[in-house]
A protein has these predicted regions:
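Substrate-binding groove/exosite segments of carbohydrate-active enzymes
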Residues: 68-176, 180-181, 189, 197, ...
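Acidic/polar, glycine-enriched structural segments that form the non-catalytic walls/loops
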Residues: 1-113, 186, 193-205
């Protein structure tokens, strides 16, 4: 739902058979405009909240600054790059919803809007020194959808769990690195052990021939 609180908004769209060739929103107003996009999964609740743009922007800026403040300090030469990296990580965090049982970090919110079953390890390492809870969730998130065989899905999102491929088993290495900085509890260590055991056994049972491990596809 696109709700125009101030100004005007006009939809310009051209349809061909079952889909649109393009969709354009022409927005404007004599004194500016303010429109909101509200995601609706089933039925509209008939609620149109009033938003103050400056206040919403301030809350978002405060959330970003709080995230950055907990990241490790960098030398002056690297601060601009570190700020951009922190912003990209922060902006890719999404709330639990649908198939996502915990907070997750997508690869981006541009077009790689998934969590892939090895990229998430690098996300966990990136957050381990400033955001231990997010780092733990990022490292263990694939366990939420681990198959009974031990296999991990190729990727997950709020809407999909995809099994087309598998990814390199770097999760044990990642856990070892995380243990250097994260104060993992006995319960977390037990959860990680069960996860890694099933994952390792899957490789030994289903991806080994003549003593060598193999991939079925280049995307693996």
């Amino acid at each position: 739902l696109i709700y125009v609180q101030e100004g005007c908004c006009q939809l310009d769209q051209r349809w061909e058979e079952s889909s649109s060739l393009y969709s354009r929103l022409n927005i404007g107003g004599e004194n500016g405009f303010l429109c909101m996009v509200k995601e609706i999964e089933t039925e509209w609740d008939q609620h149109l909240p009033h938003w103050a743009f400056d206040a919403a922007r301030q809350r978002t800026e405060q959330d970003l600054q709080a995230y950055l403040a907990d990241m490790p300090a960098l030398a002056p030469a690297y601060q601009q790059m570190g700020h951009m990296a922190g912003y990209l990580n922060w902006s890719s965090i999404v709330r639990p919803d649908g198939f996502l049982k915990r907070e997750a970090m997508y690869m981006s919110k541009n077009w790689m809007t998934n969590v892939w079953s090895w990229d998430h390890c690098f996300n966990a390492l990136a957050m381990s020194k400033g955001h231990p809870a997010l780092a733990w969730d990022a490292s263990i998130i694939m366990a939420d959808h681990q198959d009974v065989s031990g296999r991990l899905p190729d990727s997950i999102s709020d809407q999909h769990v995809i099994w087309n491929y598998c990814k390199p088993p770097i999760h044990g290495w990642t856990l070892r690195r995380l243990m250097e900085t994260l104060p993992l509890s006995p319960a977390q260590m037990e959860e990680a052990y069960r996860f890694l055991s099933r994952w390792t056994q899957w490789w030994m049972r289903y991806r080994r021939r003549d003593g060598l491990y193999y991939y079925n596809h280049g995307n693996d």
